[in-house]
Regions:
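Conserved catalytic core of two-component sensor histidine kinases
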Residues: 9, 16, 86
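Residue-level signal for the nucleotide or nucleotide-sugar donor/cofactor binding architecture
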Residues: 10-13, 80
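Amphipathic alpha-helical segments
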Residues: 14-29
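Conserved beta-strand-loop-alpha-helix junction that forms the acyl-donor binding cleft
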Residues: 12-14, 105-106
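Conserved active-site tyrosine of GNAT-family acetyltransferases
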Residues: 18-22, 92, 119
Length: 135
């Protein structure tokens, strides 16, 4: 079995600000799946992030929405170059996110990270698997 699409659902307080943030970072919006309760950010042809208002998110889960002082998930995305990694993180920070830690360079893999305007953690990576050390 193989998954053919992934939709990550995350709660947010403000749909419009979230839409503006991710557009400024450089991602497109699937308007067909967006409205005043949700915005669908297109990460790739098969990967989407559905940012849902906290109230709407609650209709899918009986568990409470975290209040911002806890971490339930860190979303990791892979890009095509170190430059793209820094471009995304720098654009996120320029639009209200904050950098989680200094970039990590492992030679074959490069990672940078940020907390978005809603407090969600993002690890942004580039990996050259042909250079991965063999143990």
């Amino acid at each position: 079995m193989k998954v053919n699409q992934i939709y990550v659902n995350l709660p947010v307080k403000d749909i419009q600000k979230t839409k503006e943030f991710w557009t400024r970072v450089g991602f497109s919006i699937n308007e067909q799946f967006s409205d005043d309760k949700a915005v669908c950010v297109v990460m790739s042809d098969t990967i989407y992030v559905m940012f849902l208002t906290e109230e709407y998110f609650q209709t899918f889960s009986e568990r409470p929405v975290p209040k911002g002082d806890t971490t339930q998930v860190l979303v990791a995305i892979g890009l095509n170059s170190r430059e793209e990694v820094d471009q995304v993180v720098n654009a996120a920070v320029a639009n209200g996110a904050y950098q989680h830690e200094e970039p990590q360079d492992y030679g074959w893999m490069y990672q940078n990270s940020f907390w978005d305007i809603n407090g969600h953690g993002w690890n942004v990576t580039f990996a050259d698997m042909s250079q991965m050390p063999q143990e």
